[in-house]
């Protein structure tokens, strides 16, 4: 199971600037500062997987911050408790108290103003069944306005880590969870006069498509399709309690893609939230449903690194200069070779190439004789590394022509097609494979050359 990072929505007010530390291997120290009525400052000391220590800090130091040190790596934070409320000279609510709990059963001091341990304001608890906190996010200006956390689930494998952003919106309805996929191919959004009532997602997983449906389908719906090189970057939503309904539900959705395209459905009204994880793409949804979509959350995964384009190298054709020049181009590899012989040498060649999942047949070069053709077929995992051959000047043919060809792969050699006579040649480059052919031909094959790329795999 890959690591899944669960991002819990922050508690507190909406003032200050948003910040997000993302995730680390663990937390080593926490520093908290305060004034007479609120938490004004936090500082976190994280440890990365390679042991490097990273420090982040937010807010403003008024009084000397207090320190809480964990016995890293044997101890970690599993819960954060606190309070938030409105205070004098603050336009929105702010965090007034914090307590950190650890896997060793320890508690930090009660940070923030209090009277003999008594606190005021709205209490909150952030925990997830003893799971480890590996990062923080929130809002701050001259104080700590809001605080949220990342929990880690699962164990690290070769699979890339996935971020699960908690569902936001209403609290009613049935819980649903599509899980994470390779990507989202298309989505359909249904609505009535005041709510998002239906969601249909078409996901991709291992080259196959899977469709998940939620809510109640309506006549009014909008389909939004993504291009193969496009992904959903973020979802902005509003939620409210429409007048004629008793539940808080999602009222609008705006999907934004990596190409800058957007798709809007619904009616904006109520509170707003955004599902987004910087530098990552959306790969799945979860939420709550009833007669409408009550709440919505999402999964985010790393953006795949594009496969670098490997420049192809064209090796000059060897042989005579007669006939017309030809060039099959560049492919992923060679699948089949057809060679036709004439009375004095090679009269005809044709190549079948691999391009992605497709087979592409090259043009005929030369002229097929009554002797027909012989073929050399490559197996899965086999690729061409070189060509050996001979060319010579033949009576009745104006310029030299190819007399014989023999093909070498990473596994074997073909039988020679033709006779060993004339000038010998070899085409190929160490550490490269052949991905295309070119040359010159008339009624016979006068010359042949190859295009090669570095060997990166055997497919």
Curated annotation (Swiss-Prot):
Result of knocking out the encoding gene: Smaller PYK10 complexes.
SUPFAM superfamilies: Mannose-binding lectins
Keywords tagged on the record: Lectin, Repeat
Domain Jacalin-type lectin per the UniProt entry, residue ranges: 5-153, 162-302, 312-454
MF terms in GO: carbohydrate binding
Domain of life from the UniProt record: Eukaryota
A GO cellular component annotation in the UniProt record: plant-type vacuole
InterPro entries linked: Jacalin-like_lectin_dom, Jacalin-like_lectin_dom_plant, Jacalin-like_lectin_dom_sf
Family under the similarity heading: Belongs to the jacalin lectin family.
Assembly and binders: Component of the PYK10 complex, at least composed of PYK10/BGLU23, BGLU21, BGLU22, JAL22, JAL23, PBP1/JAL30, PBP2/JAL31, JAL32, JAL33, JAL34, JAL35, GLL22 and GLL23.
Its job: Polymerizer-type lectin that may facilitate the correct polymerization and activation of BGLU23/PYK10 upon tissue damage.
Name this polypeptide is given: Jacalin-related lectin 23
Natural source organism: Arabidopsis thaliana
Lineage of source species: Eukaryota, Viridiplantae, Streptophyta, Embryophyta, Tracheophyta
Gene symbol of the encoding locus: JAL23
């Amino acid at each position: 199971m890959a690591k899944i990072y669960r991002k819990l929505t922050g508690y507190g007010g909406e003032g200050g600037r948003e910040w997000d530390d993302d995730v680390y291997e663990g937390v080593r120290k926490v520093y908290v500062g305060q004034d007479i009525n609120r938490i004004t400052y936090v500082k976190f000391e994280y440890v990365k997987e390679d042991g490097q220590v990273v420090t982040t800090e937010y807010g403003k130091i008024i009084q000397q911050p207090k320190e809480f040190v964990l016995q890293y790596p044997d101890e970690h934070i599993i819960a954060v408790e606190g309070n938030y409320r409105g205070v004098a000279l603050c336009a929105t609510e702010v965090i007034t108290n914090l307590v950190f709990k650890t896997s060793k059963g320890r508690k930090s001091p009660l940070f923030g103003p209090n009277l003999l341990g008594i606190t005021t304001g709205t209490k909150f608890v952030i925990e997830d069944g003893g799971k480890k906190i590996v990062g923080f996010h929130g809002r701050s200006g001259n104080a700590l306005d809001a605080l949220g956390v990342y929990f880690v689930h699962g164990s690290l494998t070769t699979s890339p880590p996935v971020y699960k952003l908690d569902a936001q919106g209403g609290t009613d309805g049935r819980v649903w969870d599509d899980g994470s996929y390779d990507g989202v191919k298309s989505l359909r959004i249904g609505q009535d006069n005041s709510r998002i009532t239906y969601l249909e997602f078409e996901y991709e997983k291992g080259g196959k498509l899977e469709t998940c449906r939620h809510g109640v389908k309506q006549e009014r719906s909008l389909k939004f399709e993504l291009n193969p090189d496009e992904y959903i970057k973020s979802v902005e939503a509003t939620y409210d309690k429409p007048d004629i309904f008793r539940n808080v539900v999602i009222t609008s959705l705006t999907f934004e893609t990596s190409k800058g395209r957007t798709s809007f459905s619904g009616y904006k009204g109520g509170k707003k939230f955004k599902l987004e994880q910087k530098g990552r793409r959306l790969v799945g949804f979860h939420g709550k449903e009833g007669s409408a979509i009550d709440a919505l959350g999402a999964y985010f995964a790393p953006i795949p690194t594009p496969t670098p384009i490997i420049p192809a190298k064209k090796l000059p054709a060897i042989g005579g200069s007669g006939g017309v020049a030809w060039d099959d181009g560049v492919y992923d590899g060679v699948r089949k070779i057809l060679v036709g012989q004439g009375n004095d040498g090679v009269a005809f060649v044709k190549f079948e190439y691999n391009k992605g999942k497709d087979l592409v047949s090259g043009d005929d070069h030369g002229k097929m004789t009554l002797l027909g053709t012989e073929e050399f077929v490559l197996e899965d995992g086999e690729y061409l590394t070189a060509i050996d051959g001979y060319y010579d000047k033949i009576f009745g043919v104006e310029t030299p022509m190819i007399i014989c060809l023999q093909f070498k792969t990473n596994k074997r050699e073909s039988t020679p097609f033709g006779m060993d006579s004339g000038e010998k040649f070899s085409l190929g480059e160490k550490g490269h494979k052949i991905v295309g052919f070119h040359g010159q031909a008339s009624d016979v094959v006068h010359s042949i050359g190859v295009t090669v790329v570095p060997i990166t795999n055997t497919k």
